[in-house]
Amino acid sequence: MKVLIVGGGGREHAIAWKISQSPKVEKLYCAPGNAGIAKVAECVDIGVMDFEKLVAFAGEQAIDLVVVGPDDPLAAGAVDAFENAGIRVFGPRKNAAILEASKAFSKDLMKKYNIPSAAYETFDSPEAALAYLETAPMPIVLKADGLALGKGVLICSTREEAKEGVKTLMLDKQFGSAGDRIVIEEFMTGREVSVLSFVDGKTIKIMTSAQDHKRAKDGDQGLNTGGMGTFSPSPFYTDEVDAFCRKYVYQPTVDAMKAEGREFKGIIFFGLMLTESGPKVLEYNARFGDPETQVVLPRMKNDIVDVFEACVDGTLDQIELEFEDNAAVCVVLASDGYPEHYDKGYKIDGLDRFDGQDGYYVFHAGSRFDKDGNIVTNGGRVLGVTAKGNTLKEARENAYKATEWVEFGNKYMRNDIGKAIDEVGVVM
């Protein structure tokens, strides 16, 4: 069969790498792709939001399955566009992708269906938000309602900071229309865990847990980013947590969306906070996480195309997901200065060191070919270096060793990805 992936980041490279291993797939395309994806797929120069061209291309090439990676096209109706043209596509329709595209929608859904989450209020006017902050307990969390590249969440320790945050989101429009409406919610403490799942509209199958590192600098300092590294599984995601979430979070979310007439097919990524009073939902994403995908898919044993098709066909109940009994760590190599100002166009050396290295992977997030055919940097997050190991500590050691194999002019990384592994009472 012929498959088209929409996207061009590290997440899509991991998906493309996984799809390329399926014996079912004879031809793989990716639009727009990147220099790493070009190793496993034919890259097509069409932007992720250019639905007309994407649908036309899929029609011309007789594509059997489309996989939409990023949140923006999903929220804007990419799946609807392919479906309307009679093309099989994996991902949620626009009316279901709202689960991620509107924080206010997801909070209201959780409240209505008693899915555990932080207490919150929603505001459309900065004046009302500021008035509310006069008496609200600190610290507090502000969230832009719309999509903001994973950066639209502000944790404010003081009232002054919170008021400044309202100004940033609603008046200065740092994230554009995403901040027209904001959610203000109570600050929760605990361990954060990400859990990825496949959904076919009624059945949900949990993949495995992971833990992201959002801040740009070591020690969880600096600005929020799209993610600087991750590990899987999370040692804090215990059997007790899993049992609780299956009963009160996972299936109830799928059932709630169905009850609202917004049947969800695709990936639901649950951002959880493990609080003293039990697990609570921090956020939903309606797609694979980035860089979580880069540690989850290398551990997955299934043919991913089988799972994609089962989600599209509503037969996910017949699939048993299987994961290796090991661990993986991904360290993101970024351009120095990310997520603010950084230079691009540096030549990347050493990528061939990963060829034939079992258990070591380099997933390209921001790379392209220059006019001489060299692979150069082309984004804030450039590469995700993933390594597996029998334990989390071994995987972490392997991942950091592999970061030394590649070089580019302004290479930057966090040196403490997976530090929480050392904080676990039990040896993984």
PLM regions: where:
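Active-site "cap" helix and flanking loop/linker of ATP-utilizing ligase/carboxylase catalytic domains
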Residues: R246-I268, N285-Q357, D370
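Solvent-exposed alpha-helices and their adjacent loops that cap or buttress functional pockets
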Residues: S20-Q21, G36-A38, E60, F90, ...
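Internal nucleotide-binding/catalytic subdomain
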Residues: V153-T293
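ATP-binding N-terminal substructure of ATP-dependent carboxylate-amine bond-forming enzymes
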Residues: M1-K94
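Generic C-terminus detector
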Residues: S367-D372, V376-M428
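Short acidic-hydrophobic, aromatic-tinged amphipathic segments that line or gate anion-handling sites
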Residues: C43-M49, E121-S125, C156
